[in-house]
Amino acid sequence: ETELERLALAQLAHRAETGYVQVECGIMDQFASALARAGHALLLHCADESFEHVAIHGSDFEVLVMDTKKPRTLAGSAFNARVRECRESHAVLREHVRDLPWLAQYTAEDLARAGERLSGVQRARATHVVEEMERVASAVTALVAGDVRTFGALVHASHRSTATHYAVSCDELDVITDLACAQPATFGARLTGAGFGGCAIALVEPGAAESVVEPVREGFRARFGVEPGFRVLHAGPGPRELQG
């Protein structure tokens, strides 16, 4: 398959999610699945669906997936609400600050200029989007430089913003990421997917996953009475035919 064919596959899967399932999600998950490359992260520009593969230094960290076992029962309706809130924020900024095609193109200075025209919820959602764009750019720089500590710190800052400004986290996700980040071998952690339950990831020192898993398991079980799941993963290729 060519990258063009994989792009078409991602677009088709996205249409199924938004048109049939009726969740107004972005196309990041479909892109990550269809266009993944072994040993690389994927930098996606959602405005025009352009993308870049960014090499991961394989010896720098491992990805520890942590499953809270909490079903994401609110993810669909709440995710649609976040999309609506972002559109409302964008409309205010276009009318009262400057006319830009995407919310992600605004700056912290633009949000300050909007003043009280943005409601508290609108400001929180816009703040997450604007600051997340800055974090992504900084994260790519750190990843290219092999600066895993800065990369991990940005990942955890992303989680905190997702929880406080975008409000798609939950107690289970906050606790499991905080427990992971309290371990010396962890560089950073954040929720994955739509939030409201499901999994988080932690970036951990190579070969040190078990030293993170045990205290996280004990702390999470003591808090919620649930045994979380764990798995160490690495960046692999996208979908392909398996032979024999």
Regions found by a protein language model. Name each.
Residues 31, 199, 229:
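Conserved beta-strand and immediately adjacent loop positions that scaffold enzyme active sites
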Residues 1-65:
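Fold-level recognition of mixed alpha/beta catalytic cores in primary-metabolism enzymes, strongest
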Residues 40-188, 203-244:
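C-terminal nucleotide
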Residues 197-203:
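Short beta-strand->loop micro-motif that forms the acidic, two-metal-ion catalytic signature
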